[in-house]
Amino acid sequence: LATNAEPIIVSMASAVAEIPSAFGIRCEYLPGENRGWVSRSNWDLYIRDRIVALIDETDAKVLVFDGVIPHAGFVAARNARPAVKLVWMRRGLWQKKVHRFALPLQSAAMDYVIEPGDYAFAYDHGPTSKRTEAIRTAPVSLYQASEALNREASRNALGLDQSRPAVLVQLGTGADDANEKMTAALKGLIGWPDLQVVLTKEPIDKSGKSLAPEGLDLKVIKFFPLAKVLAAFDAGVCATGYNGVHELLAAKLPTVLVSNIRGMDDQEARARWCHDFGYALRANQADLNNITETVKELQDPNMRASLSFKCAELPAPIGGEEIANKLLKIAA
C-alpha cells in the first residue's frame, strides 16, 4: 500500500511508536479513553477533531477503522467530512455478547465492511457469520515467508544461543487468572534440556512477584516485528488471538494455544478448529493442570514435527495485499 498511497496509522496503543522504524509508515498516537484523562463525551470530541485535522492535513480519501466497535468520535469525523469513504475492518469469530446488538446500526454507518479471513472461519457461528455486507479476504498476517529471516539470522537478531532449543511464550498477565495460566504454561516447559524460554515482557504480577517457576532460563526480548524472526523458535505458546494464530501457524511453528475468553474475540472457537484439524494443540484454558500437560507435549520432537508438517497445508496469508488493493480502488 505504501508504494501507491500514503497510509497513516492512528492508534491508541503506545506500541505504535515501533511501526515507523520497522515499516516506514507514518503513525499518530491518540491517548485512549482508558487513560481517564477526560470524560467519555469529551474524548469522543477529541478523537473527532484529531481525525478531522488529519483528513484536512493529508487530503485523505479513505478512513479505515480496524477494531471491534467503531468509536463515536471516529464516525463523527467522517460525518464532518462526508466525501471521505468510511471502511470498517471487522474481524469475524465474535462471541455472542451484548455488542452484537449494535452490529446492524454500525454496519449501516459504513461505506464498506472488510472481513480479514480467518483460518478457523468454518467454526464461526457468531453474530457476524451470517451477515452479508462484508467483503471477505484471505487471512492477514505480519508473517510473510519471503520477508522472514532464517533460523541463524533470527537467533542472531534476538541474541539467542544457536545450539540450544528455544520456545516463545506470548501470554498476557495482570488479572489473577491470566497470571495462573502463565505459571501453568511455564511449568510445562520444565525438564526440556538446555531450553531457552523467550518472552516479550517480564512474567511478573502487579506486585512485581515472578510468575515463573524455578529452573527455567528466561530471556525477555524486544523485537518488532516478531513475525520476522519466528524461525528462531522450536515451539510457541500463545493466546488464540487473530494475530498470534495467523503468525505462528503461518510460520509452521508448533504451538499450544491458551485462549483468553475475556474479549469479544471467540478464541475458544479458533483454538478448537486449530486443534481438531491438527494445526496446533489446544489447552483447556479453564484447567491449569491441562495447560501444563498440553505444553509439556511440545517437548516431544515427533509432536513438533507433526504440527509443523500440518501447518504447511495452511493457505498463504495474503489478505493484506488483497485489502490494500481494495482500499486503493475505494480511494480512486
Segments (PLM) and residue ranges:
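Donor-nucleotide binding loops and adjacent catalytic segments primarily
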Residues: 149-235
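Acidic donor-binding loop of glycosyltransferase active sites
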Residues: 231-244, 253
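A nucleotide-sugar donor-handling region in carbohydrate enzymes
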Residues: 91, 95-98, 103-173
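Short N-terminal targeting/anchoring amphipathic segment
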Residues: 52-70
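C-terminal alpha-helical cap of glycosyltransferases
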Residues: 296-297, 316-332
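Conserved nucleotide-sugar phosphate-binding/catalytic loop shared by glycosyltransferases and other
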Residues: 3-53
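Catalytic binding pocket for nucleotide-activated donors in carbohydrate/polymer assembly enzymes
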Residues: 244-292
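Conserved donor-nucleotide binding/catalytic region of nucleotide-linked donor-dependent transferases
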Residues: 281, 286-314
